[in-house]
Amino acid sequence: MVEPDMQKKASGGSGGSEMDTLNATSNSSKQGVSNNKRNPVSKKKPGNKVSDGRDNAHNYHGEGRRKSSKQQRSRTPYKETSTRINDQDIDLSIQEEILGGNFKLRGRKTQVSINHLLNFQLPEVEREKSRSSSSKKSNRRRDEHVHLHGDTFVNVNYRLLVDDRFDYPEQNCNPNVPVDQEKILRVIVPKGQNCSICLSEEPVAPRMVTCGHIFCLSCLLNFFSIEETVKNKETGYSKKKKYKECPLCGSIIGPKRVKPVLYEDDFDVTRLNQKPEPGATVHLQLMCKPHGSLLPLPVALHLDPLKCGNFPPANLGSIKHYAHIMKCGVSYSLELYQKDIVAIQEQYEIDKAIYNDSGKFVKQSIENINDQISTLLAATTDLSPLSNDINNGLDNFHFDDDLLTKYDDSSAYFFYQTLVASSTKYFLSPLDVKILLTIFHYYSKFPESIETTVENIHYDTVVTEQLIRRYKYIGHLPIGTEIALLDLDWRKIPFLPKEIYEQFAHELKQRRRKFTMKKQKEDKEKKLYEKRLEQEHAEFYRKENGNSLKFEDSVQMATHYESIVSSSIPLNSLGISMLGPPTNSCSTPQKQAPSHTKRTIWGTSIAVTEDEKASKENKEFQDMLLQRIRQEDSSDVTDSTDSPPTSNGKRGRKKKGKVMLFSSNHQALG
């Protein structure tokens, strides 16, 4: 609060000066009006910069709004009067607005503190709290959004085979740092990605470009050999395009940024179990990750992760499923290159027999692989020491370490995981971990494996820095990795005590209830979407066919169709013949219009109902024709019996009358 003495001093000391200023301004305005009448065209005098700044500040703080428009107009040509407004008047106007509650903080003025002028402290605490909370929210949103592209995308979603002749200190400390291009020997990917150029289900000698898409080596060389030109619309000049774009995503790619690919099946990766699904049985393994290590291993292996290192050798079959980066020797890399050459030659024989392929890009592919082999051999002076080092390293691994006696909760992280070879990592939900911790009291006392039923799976979770700070056992995963949380059905777990289940029964029921409500909501939204899509298609077909049926009628037809589908009456398949009424002993027979199936221009079959009046006329016309034909036949028989015989002993036969049919509902006889 401002002291009363200061308020009196401020009001008493500045009252006279303010009145003098107003009088001087009014007199100057009158004089300015009279001078403007005498001299309508007059030159403006150069204004003072200091007075201009004070005048703008005076108008900003509200003093100028209390004056008339006439005074404001007169102040512009004569700025000498503004020099009488001193700093004391500006401070007084600010003080009055603050006391009246009309002062608003706007623009850069908010960064200037005026507390020393008023001798009291403004309440800045609430504003700082709101500012800090908003900044935390913005930072949280920024952390949750992870953009992956290029090497970061490859580092997150795929495993790598790297050259064992190099050390990787940056990757040892931070899993988010991508490995250099020249140190990557193979990128291990799961099967299922087709080559978008030749559309083969399994690319031959697969290669990965910068964006992460996979192509055949020969297809990729053919793509890079095509020269594209760009034409300038203004000048009409065409020039060669300097770069290539990915056929799938449009990212800039080049022949020097291509990585060899190795499929998991070729790498003898066996799936421990299938992808988890709600209601299915899942096998969970207890993983152990010591502090400072980036390699979690199952406790059942009895292998110390610190002895294996963060990047174990690739030919160690028992742990190659769990390592994100593995070291590979030159001999194994040469073996993989030889497999690529054999695959290219086999595919060429097939293409030559079927398509009469010239083999131009096949030769270029083999030459490209030979160049890579030469580069690899040139960098290696002697291959035997490398293989000996790998074999000696394998002898150091012992599968008799008891991890539970060596590590506990204070020295390692213990957690459950399944399907470790997948790009999406599956872990237990926090509530399930809490229940297990209540049962066994320590993470290291958890069972080595659990086989139970999955109740629900939560997807759409991405590893961020905030998530790693919350769950430290996922610190070995790169930022951007997709994870899924599994909810277990604790009603089917035998080792759960009854009292502990009752302790968490409310939370489990609430979680199950939320899952049921979410599923019902999704099913409802799906039905609404399908109904809306069906209505849009029906509206489109009606517009194309020129039918003037209203949208409300289409909704009624759709409702009627749904009622027919949901009824208990068995619906037989529609044939080309007319459909009769449904046979049902419980229901009364109803008269229905006959229907036919008609094939539309889109290749679909639809039921077509004929007009009853037209059908009745057609039926009468057909009956009349049959009756007329019978009469003609009977008349022929009587004529043949009554006619006299001819000279050669045969009776004469009368010629039949003709019946002419026209394409109308009316009969015409001739």
UniProtKB/Swiss-Prot annotation:
It holds the Pfam family zf-RING_UBOX. Present with 922 molecules/cell in log phase SD medium. One of its GO terms (biological process) is nonfunctional rRNA decay. PROSITE patterns: ZF_RING_1, ZF_RING_2. Its EC number is 2.3.2.27. Residues 51-66, 610-622 have a biased composition (Basic and acidic residues). Belongs to the RNF10 family. It comes from Saccharomyces cerevisiae (strain ATCC 204508 / S288c) (Baker's yeast). A zinc finger (RING-type) spans 195-250. Pathway: Protein modification; protein ubiquitination. This is E3 ubiquitin-protein ligase MAG2. Residues 1-84, 124-145, 609-670 are annotated as: Disordered. It is found in: Cytoplasm. It catalyses: S-ubiquitinyl-[E2 ubiquitin-conjugating enzyme]-L-cysteine + [acceptor protein]-L-lysine = [E2 ubiquitin-conjugating enzyme]-L-cysteine + N(6)-ubiquitinyl-[acceptor protein]-L-lysine. InterPro entries: MAG2/RNF10 (IPR039739), Znf-RING_euk (IPR027370), Znf_RING (IPR001841), Znf_RING/FYVE/PHD (IPR013083), Znf_RING_CS (IPR017907).
